């Protein structure tokens, strides 16, 4: 019954959705980074935007981001609740990331980033359980900023997916598949399939994602 109600709500939302692409409502992006961090920068440029997990909830309603939205409107996950997680850029990312200095977060001074560590992981355990109790299907966007910062953190998501059948994850990682963290992320795709839809940045092909230089031809 709960799933039918959420699907009906998604259908109403789909009919109401409007085009929010930047090329329709404002100036198209130039492809040139507006703010470039120093090569030695190790964390966010905006330390005042850091939050402790106890300030939570750490999982935010997808409605807070117009490009994501709060609910899946079409497809096999129609009706799923969408939430997002934002960590500290660079502090949680591999140093090999091609976007280290030109990170999206450089132009996001007001976005709250949650400090990583055991308190974050404990908060995620609680919040995912509560969301999966309330909704038949929950889709988590990892990460608006930041990345998978440790093997223990990756293992947390493995446990959560095994524990909650209605949990789904999508996002990107800068960890190459040849690294320990990257190979674990790729292995989880084999285990959980589309429930763990995490792509590797900086490469093409299946499960890859890359930046196209501007201007395009």
Functional labels for PLM-detected ranges:
Residues 1-217:
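Class I S-adenosyl-L-methionine
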């Amino acid at each position: 019954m709960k799933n039918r109600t959420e699907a009906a709500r998604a259908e109403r939302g789909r009919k109401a959705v409007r085009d929010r692409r930047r090329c329709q409502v404002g100036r198209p992006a130039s492809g040139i980074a507006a703010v470039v961090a120093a090569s030695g920068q190790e964390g966010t440029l905006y330390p005042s935007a850091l939050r402790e997990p106890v300030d939570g909830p750490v999982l935010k309603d997808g409605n807070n981001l117009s490009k994501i939205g709060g609910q899946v409107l079409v497809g096999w996950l129609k009706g799923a609740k969408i939430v997002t997680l934002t960590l500290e850029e660079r502090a949680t990312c591999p140093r090999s990331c091609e976007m280290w200095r030109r990170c999206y977060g450089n132009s996001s001074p007001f976005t709250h980033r949650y400090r990583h560590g055991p308190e974050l992981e404990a908060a995620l355990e609680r919040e995912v359980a509560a969301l999966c109790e309330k909704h038949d299907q929950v889709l988590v966007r990892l990460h608006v900023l930041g990345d998978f910062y440790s093997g223990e953190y990756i293992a947390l998501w493995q446990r959560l997916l095994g524990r909650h059948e209605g949990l789904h994850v999508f996002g990107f990682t800068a960890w190459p598949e040849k690294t320990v963290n990257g190979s674990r992320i790729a292995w989880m795709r084999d285990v959980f399939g589309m429930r763990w839809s995490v792509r590797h940045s900086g490469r093409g092909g299946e499960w890859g994602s890359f930046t196209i230089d501007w201007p395009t031809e």
